Amino acid sequence: MKSDIQICRDTALTPIDQIALMAGIEPQDLTPQGTLKAKVKPSILNRLADKPEGKLVLVTAITPTPLGEGKTVTTIGLAQGLAKINKRVIACIRQPSMGPVFGVKGGAAGGGYSQVAPMEKLNLHLTGDIHAVTAAHNLAAAALDARLYHEERHGYEAFSDKTGLPALRIDIKNIVWKRVMDHNDRALRMITVGKNEAGKAINGLEREDGFDISAASEIMAILALSKDLADMRQRIGRVVLAYNIDGNPITAEDLQVAGAMTVTMCEAIEPTLMQTLEGVATLIHAGPFANIAHGNSSIIADRIALKLSEFTVTEGGFGSDMGFEKACNIKAQQADRGPDCAVVVATLRGLKANSGLYDLRPGQALPDAIFSPDEKALIAGFDNLKWHIRNAAQYGLPVVVAINRFPQDTDVELELLKNMVADTDFSTYVGVAISEAFGKGGEGATELAQAVVKACETPANFKPLYSLSQSLEEKLMAVAEVGYGARSIELSDCAKEQLATLKKHGHDNLAVCLAKTPLSITTDPGIKGAPSDFVVPVRELKLCAGAGFVYALCGNVMTMPGLPEKPAYMNLDIDADGNIVGLS
């Protein structure tokens, strides 16, 4: 089979203005960015206000291997499959970060014959939204350090007399806003800024700082959760950058930088329209990771797609304990709109990896045996799929299991897994279909599409795990105990102090976003299957007042990834004709 990029390159694509018209997007709603991608103006929602909404299908997965289990392939394949059975459909996905593109996973455009195209445009820069997020975020960081420098240089009273501005009295030891970049770079996790030559202070005040990856930026979360430009402006103003010497928060509004940050983001708020290899309209917008952020594409893109189509297919990052949980408890509560159906992607290799019969270690390649027939391991790993089905169902949703077929998979094991799903009593609607979207495109996903249409005939009774009116502790416990199946949570001394500060400043009404490993339902990546009776350790709590959640760092999760020993960038090059090679 040809490589992903070769398949994409060999496929004749439709001009984006025609894709837009077929989807119901008129020329005045569109800002073309060349012939194969365009920005869609959020003002389209004014024209579509009276149109009914279609069904929202949320794709999730079992606990994945580091290779991923084909969730984006399934999302794109399902959209193409729905189009094959004559349903109006739009897919909504996140913009890929260049960190994973150059790191371990490679691109995030799907694969095989279920891709968003051109895949190299999607995976590398696209329309620059992530760069806009990075610029807006780092503008706030630069403004904060500049204000700190000038206030300390002059003294608070003299600074106010000179500028007419109130002194913010920034506590240099309580600055919470790091810088960001769209690369994996572990060397930048802990740095010192403001270093000067002896006797000089022209470079600012020396302090400890660090970088996160742009996908973990609160500005990225704000982009994904804003309803419109005015909402984004207000949210950016609420971002807390530091605390003053009295312990009170200093916001982007206080620093008078929120307006400029929003100006930097004014085009990023427009979703980007592209197409699948079969000409299905796809909206790409925002790119928060699901392990260290909330892991879903934007509310704006969903709202546009729901008004234009019978079915909107979107995805939450990693397994149902990750992006799916955050879609249901964060995104849905802010959008006032829950999904109508959950699709759980499962693979033979992924279930075998969760069997407990293989010695799997983080950072090491999967053993060759896991790709070979092994019914014992498949049966043992089935507990993980059952866990994810029941987890999705507890939100009141009908569930469809999509068994994503790989070339090495045998018919015997695929049918065994399909029968195990069909023969298990889940006390809710659970459909199952084998998806061959990777190798056959939409034609290979029509069985899955029909199963999803049938599932959506069952009315959803969507209900998040918690109400925003509950306390932060109750919300953390709800996610850990109900969302993960843990026995309890355990707050570090640092987290307890931060919790008290959050309550003091009136942030008890925010959602919670738990950052943890995606490779286990627990916070330990080495624990596979469907564990229970474990504790979720919360080491740190961070306020994301603009995004509307409190960020809980659990276990050893890092907000700036590092590159592996053999990164994916080693495979990338460009030929004499300007064609990119090695991107997957």
Swiss-Prot record:
Alphabetized InterPro entries for the sequence = Formate_THF_ligase, Formate_THF_ligase_CS, P-loop_NTPase
* EC primary class: ligase
* Biological processes annotated in GO: tetrahydrofolate interconversion
Q: In which pathway is this protein known to take part?
A: One-carbon metabolism; tetrahydrofolate interconversion
Q: Which UniProt keywords apply?
A: ATP-binding, Ligase, Nucleotide-binding, One-carbon metabolism
The terms under GO molecular function for this entry are: ATP binding; formate-tetrahydrofolate ligase activity
UniProt keyword Nucleotide-binding present: yes
The entry's ATP-binding residues are T65, P66, L67, G68, E69, G70, K71, T72
Please indicate which superkingdom the organism of origin belongs to. Bacteria
EC number, UniProt record: 6.3.4.3
Name the chemical reaction catalysed here: (6S)-5,6,7,8-tetrahydrofolate + formate + ATP = (6R)-10-formyltetrahydrofolate + ADP + phosphate
Q: Which NCBIfam families match?
A: PRK13505.1, PRK13506.1
What protein family does this chain belong to?
Answer: Belongs to the formate--tetrahydrofolate ligase family.
UniProt protein name:
Formate--tetrahydrofolate ligase
What's the source species for this entry?
Answer: Photobacterium profundum (strain SS9)
